Amino acid sequence: MGDSIVWGQGLAYEHKTASILARHLGTEINMMAHAGAKIGIRDSYTVTMPSREVPCFFPTILQQLQEFSGDPASVKWVLMNGGINDVEVQRVFNPMVPQYELELHTRNYCGRDLLAILQQVTQKFPSALALVLGYYPALSHLSRLEGVESLYSLVHGVRFAPLSDAGLFRNELVEHCLRFWKLSTGLFRSAVEHVNRETGAKRAIFVDSGMEEANAAYAPQSLLWECETNDPDRAPDEAVEERRVAYELVGAGDLQKNQVLLSAVGHPNIAGAARMAEQCVRAVAEANTMEAAV
């Protein structure tokens, strides 16, 4: 359950982090996550898109949890995340938003609300170990300049044309991405520690994405989907046709169409999803070792 990271935006089923982890665990997936989902602690409205590839706030992650119809006691693992869509991607990618405002929203949603949903997960699934998957740096100071500008334009739907110094604008954009990544990581860790103290047991584990600044979009060792700079309107991923069909059903406008078709850009590619799966497998193995030693 969660947003596009747990869903595996742009990836074929067999390449998704959740799929790789499930194969390792020898279990089946009940996929609740979808692109664009927010935690939505205070939301009651809901709607369903024709494809999980189409970014949409709803069903929220809380609604995903509430809509689970299986036997809660049979669930052994829950892979989850959330928060960036409550903060809003446009805010993270807006250098004109003050750092303190970005930090406030990040603390509220990746801290307070992530803790709230994690507490509900551990209460609903009494036998499950929750794996809280961290975010990654979407951009870094190792990202190519044209790549930074391209991703900004995609997120906001406008040409990169700052009125002030372009270099300063790019730098602040990157700093926003790095700040969100680092702060959300710390908040996720704190939420996991809080739940484990509260329950008196190892009910949750924080799983770092395993990605560093060199793995950001347009960086030398990028593990994220990227548009080619000479063909910025061509989607690079495995699920673009699914989104194309879904877009026609939704009937959105031309601007929304382009954003939907390119919505995998900035998400973990095949290698990136595999890296996160490795991190999850390692975390599960460590948890099993600790349990056996008790």
Name each region found by the language model.
Residues R275, Q279-E291:
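C-terminal alpha-helix
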Residues W7-H105:
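Conserved SGNH/GDSL esterase-like catalytic core that processes O-acyl groups on lipids
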Residues P59-H267, A274:
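Alpha-helical cap/lid subdomain in secreted, periplasmic
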Residues S4:
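Catalytic nucleophile serine of serine hydrolases
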Residues G266, G272-A273, M290, V294:
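Cysteine endopeptidase catalytic domains of the caspase/legumain-like
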